[in-house]
Amino acid sequence: MIATEEQARAFVAERCDAAGMERIEALVAALRSENERQNLVSKGSLGEVWQRHIADSAQLLDHVSRETGLWLDLGSGAGFPGLVVAAMQPEKPVLLVESRRKRVEWLTDMVKALKLENCDVAGMRLELLEAREAGVISARAFAPLEKLLRLSARFSTDTTTWVLPKGRSAAQELQGVSRKWQKLFHVEQSVTSEEAAILVGRGRAKT
């Protein structure tokens, strides 16, 4: 379990090259600055930004093959996990979906500042996004699980990997969705908090 900011930084550094780490450092610096103007993340979490946001995002890569096609990040907000993934793995195509104007502006500015040619921002509600096949679907605090699965199912294929960070109620949330979805997922312990977990899934529910 990651217990300190130093451990969190080391965890991230082990999963990307030096250039990737420079991009993440730049992201953290920009986040600290911008958070004084808009509440991208809670002020209390900035003291543990590497644990709470960066490593928490980076750990999802451990559950995903590098050859997965498009990474679709729903409700990207401040950029977690999608922007972190794009910065750490610039060869991986990433699409950040976010409807809130100020968040869209922040994400667009960071994609440009970090020179992430692999990353695009869709500034719209997910319901309006044109259907496309996603190799990975991620979502952090986007919507209740049942709604999330219902809205995003049209982007999934038989080989799609789902990585959905959740809190202590992850297993309970999974029990609350239909059986056709339950059988695709299992619960993984988060490495950043004993009270957090990740719902990891594979494939698409059969209708």
UniProtKB/Swiss-Prot annotation:
GO terms for molecular function: rRNA (guanine-N7-)-methyltransferase activity. It is found in: Cytoplasm. S-adenosyl-L-methionine binds at G75, F80, L126, E127, R140. Belongs to the methyltransferase superfamily. RNA methyltransferase RsmG family. It catalyses: guanosine(527) in 16S rRNA + S-adenosyl-L-methionine = N(7)-methylguanosine(527) in 16S rRNA + S-adenosyl-L-homocysteine. Specifically methylates the N7 position of guanine in position 527 of 16S rRNA. This is Ribosomal RNA small subunit methyltransferase G. It holds the Pfam family GidB.
